[in-house]
Amino acid sequence: MKFYTYSGETAAEALKIAQSHHGVDTLVFKTQEIRKKTLTSSGLYEIVVAVEEEENKKAPLIPESLYDEELNEEDVVMQLSSTVEEMRKLAGVSSNQRNYTFSKNKTLLEKDAPLEDTPLEANKQDALLQALKDEANHKKEREKREVKQEEEIKDINAQLSKIRDSLKLIQNMFWDEKNPNSVNIPQEFAEIYKLAKQSGMKSSHLDEIMQLSLELMPLRMRENSVTIKRYFREVLRKIILCRPEDLNLRQKRILMLVGPTGVGKTTTLAKLAARYSRMLAKKYKVGIITLDNYRIGALEQLSWYANKMKMSIEAVIDAKDFAKEIEALEYCDFILVDTTGHSQYDKEKIAGLKEFIDGGYNIDVSLVLSVTTKYEDMKDIYDSFGVLGIDTLIFTKLDESRGLGNLFSLVHESQKPISYLSVGQEVPMDLKVATNEYLVDCMLDGFSNPNKEQA
């Protein structure tokens, strides 16, 4: 006995092809759906038929004219006997695919010798039945082995995860700062403690956060390093303050950027101007005023950006001129004010900016800081410029820093929210609205530029 495989878009089509090669009395060994029919592709069915090696080429015992003339595509297989019916069930073939109907010349069929009574047909059916049983048994055994293998793989992965956690705990037993003076850190927290400390966070702030985590974290969560990191991440998120971008303008917004030299105030202002005027769903009217008349090339740099974006730019020297330009830009939704960079130790020049801020206008003051600055210097800068009434913090050069712990410490200490982050040199793309999720990811997983990831 030989087995042949045929395929078609439907089971009936595959059976027709098989019958065209081997006759209408072909015995079906197996029917299988290979691919379901979808909107974009046709279905695919596979049928396996069993044929005697010396195929009987004679005319079939029952002429085709004896079949019901109204047979549909699904009524394609003759019901030979109860034995064949049992074989059909073992093969898992739908009864609709194997049902033969007889409506004409029934007496003639009864007079003819039954096919199953002949030795040839009986042997064929016995062999096919045994083959079907063997196939069913093999399938069950194969399924059992696959289920067992999947369970073994899951068990191995779980054991490997426990081994990795155990190795981390063993390694952390020998860490240098196992017992800080202020907080007794358990070994299972050593990995996250070292990550946070290497980021540049102030020790007292880190100890405070660790103490908070130890007090609030359930004991059952401490057995897994992934769970510990996830919990610590949530604690940091709650500590960091970020101000959402407010575009519901009831009146024009005046934003002034202040800060020390070299932190990127002018470039950040150009990014903000492009964002408000071009990159948002609504295109806002933007005007620029610069107080930076001392730095060589500062006005030219800003004028170049303003000309590219087709917006007005004015340079002023004193508070009187400043007031005039504010009135002249009354039509704008946003007025962005660039200032001269001053050292945090030049108290006199910093105080000189107050006369512009105290002119009766509602000015939103943002202190621009570079994350490449160490925490102690950041704190000095914030204290010096704090006399101007800082509303938000803008951090630049995130792409040039290896850690953001100093940023976390300053925000935690000052309780001032972060509004924007500069994540690269490209104008206007590399400006991001600050979110605590992004900052925590950068701190614990390393910096990533969201614009380049999307590209």
Curated annotation (Swiss-Prot):
Residue sites binding GTP per the record: 259-266, 338-342, 396-399
SUPFAM superfamilies, alphabetized: P-loop containing nucleoside triphosphate hydrolases
One MF annotation (Gene Ontology) recorded for this entry: signal recognition particle binding
Keyword terms, alphabetized: Bacterial flagellum biogenesis, Bacterial flagellum protein export, Cell membrane, GTP-binding, Membrane, Nucleotide-binding, Protein transport, Transport
Keyword Transit peptide: no
Membrane disposition: Peripheral membrane protein
Domain of life where this protein originates: Bacteria
Swiss-Prot/TrEMBL GO biological process terms: bacterial-type flagellum organization; protein transport; SRP-dependent cotranslational protein targeting to membrane
GO cellular component assignments: plasma membrane
Location relative to the cell: Cell membrane
Xref: InterPro entries: AAA+_ATPase (IPR003593), FlhF (IPR020006), FlhF__GTPase_dom (IPR047040), P-loop_NTPase (IPR027417), SRP54_GTPase_dom (IPR000897)
One Pfam family matching this protein: SRP54
Assigned protein family: Belongs to the GTP-binding SRP family.
Physiological role: Necessary for flagellar biosynthesis. May be involved in translocation of the flagellum.
Protein name: Flagellar biosynthesis protein FlhF
UniProt organism field: Helicobacter pylori (strain J99 / ATCC 700824) (Campylobacter pylori J99)
